[in-house]
């Protein structure tokens, strides 16, 4: 569950699609605090699961259908995206 409050503006590093799935890489800092692999981060309102964490960003798997049907479809390298961590259980 998310609060709907944007915590940080991130930047798209890359979107790599291979067939019907792909990887979205986002440059971020604040939303990484306390985040672990498997946690959820909303990217422009789309709930994605973190698959890797770097000191200045993260990656998440994304389906081609999600990109087609959401605001992620208009994202390019360098695009700003709204980021929000999921609420604690």
Model regions: which residues?
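Conserved loop->alpha-helix
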Residues: 1-89
């Amino acid at each position: 569950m998310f609060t709907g409050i944007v915590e940080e503006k991130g930047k798209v590093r890359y979107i790599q699609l291979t067939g019907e799935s792909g990887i979205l890489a986002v440059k971020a800092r604040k939303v990484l605090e306390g985040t672990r692999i498997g946690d959820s981060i909303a990217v422009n309102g789309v709930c994605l699961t973190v698959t890797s964490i770097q000191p200045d960003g993260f990656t998440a798997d994304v389906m081609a259908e999600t990109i087609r049907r959401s605001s992620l479809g208009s994202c390019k390298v360098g695009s700003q995206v709204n980021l929000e961590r999921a609420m604690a259980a």
